[in-house]
Amino acid sequence: EISACLVGSEMCIRDSSMVSTSEKYASSSLTDEKSLELFRTLERIMREEKIYKDNFITKDKVAEILGTNRTYLSRIINEQSKLSFTHYVNRFRIEEAIRLLSDPNNETPLKAISTELGFNSISTFYNLFQSSVGMTPSQYRNKVMELQKEQ
């Protein structure tokens, strides 16, 4: 059976009955070095440019920023962080929420923090925060205030 495939950015035609599964993946896989380089670039962009704050962030947008495609992006994130794209993005959002809520002088309403961090709903923010931290954002903020008063 003849089929079309994509290798790099060039289109090719192959007889798929003659191509082993490992050869298919080998021809489309990134080298470990290239994969690590792209992941480091992604980490830098996430931390410095805070693209996770975009509530319409997609694999396609991030892949375009990195000059790769969504398949490679997913593979890189999974291989390097052991997370899906969505979980990876949300990890940055929750880390930023923790940072903001750890500041006892920050009185920004939770709804505003949720929106600022790219969450489409406050309930999603609450649920993810609680599953990651073990308490709701309100509980976390109150705990920070209590600890601040004790000092």
Tell where the protein language model's regions lie, with residue ranges.
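ABC-family nucleotide-binding domains
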Residues: 118
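Membrane-proximal linker segments that couple transmembrane helices to downstream signaling/catalytic modules
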Residues: 14-115, 128-131, 138-151
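The DNA-contacting recognition helix of HTH DNA-binding domains
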Residues: 70, 121-123
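Single conserved hydrophobic/aromatic residue that forms the stacking wall/gate
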Residues: 1-15
